Design a protein with these regions (language model features):
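Structured-RNA-binding interfaces characteristic of tRNA pseudouridine synthases
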Residues: 1-239
Length: 239
């Protein structure tokens, strides 16, 4: 399992320019094992999105224990990527296909400018948000639905767009808010789209009923903006 500061990378998945988190970890593993090692992540994160608990697996022989492997890999990584744990997995384990769900959270600051040290890791909304209205909107989105309207349309073709969103809650106090989303899976940019819709509710641009109507329509509208990547964290992968 690893964590990373998404600002430095072009997302999780391997990129032609070699700037993805996957590319950097694979180069490090190549140095450790003296051969090519392909890793398989639990899923993609976009450029600028952070992770606290990204899970990946790879197949390679190692006889020196998990602690030494962790140390060997970590020593070759930049400070913006941390290997948090290493363990031997069952032979049939797959980081993506064995997962039964994921938890993301999104950080918001509202009602003024965010602290400059917080700004790189949150969406700073100038207007003070109506948090109770946002919570009402979140309740209307929770459950098993077709979330096509809350995904990037150019990435949704014949893909099954029905997901079980078991939790969408807003916590925090004062100017700092956290939106936590838990589901059996997420569509491309789904969490950021949900957050964008909830912020629109908080700003008075949408009502909770209108958010539900967008969900039922299955059609994305300009009223649903995609929240900036910098506030999103992959918190945990559930197995």
């Amino acid at each position: 399992m690893c964590a990373y500061d998404g600002r430095d990378f072009g997302g999780w998945q391997s990129q032609p320019d070699g700037r993805a988190v996957q590319d950097i970890i694979e180069r490090c593993l190549r140095s450790v094992f003296k051969r090519e090692v392909r890793i398989h992540g639990s899923g993609r994160t976009d450029a600028g999105v952070h992770a606290l608990g990204q899970v990946f697996h790879f197949d390679a022989g190692w006889r020196h224990g998990a602690a030494k492997l962790l140390a060997a890999v970590q020593s070759g990584l930049p400070r913006t990527i941390q290997i948090r744990s290493v363990r031997q997995a069952p032979r049939d384990f797959h980081a993506r296909f064995s997962a039964r769900g994921k938890i993301y959270f999104y950080q918001l600051h509202h009602g003024g400018r965010a602290d400059p040290f917080l700004h790189p890791f949150c969406w700073s909304v100038h207007q003070k948000l109506d948090v109770e209205s946002m919570r009402a909107g979140a309740q209307r989105l929770t459950g098993r639905h077709d979330f096509r309207a809350f995904s990037a349309l150019n990435r949704v073709g014949k893909e099954d767009t029905v997901r079980q969103l078991s939790r969408l809650e807003i916590t925090g106090r004062g100017a700092r808010l956290r939106v936590t989303a838990e589901a059996d899976g997420f569509l491309y940019k789904m969490v950021r789209s949900l957050v964008g819709a909830l912020v629109a509710v908080g700003e008075g641009k949408l009502t909770p009923a209108e958010v539900e109507a967008i969900l039922r329509s299955g059609r994305r509208t300009h009223a649903v903006q995609t929240a900036p990547a910098r506030g999103l964290f992959l918190a945990r992968v559930l197995y």
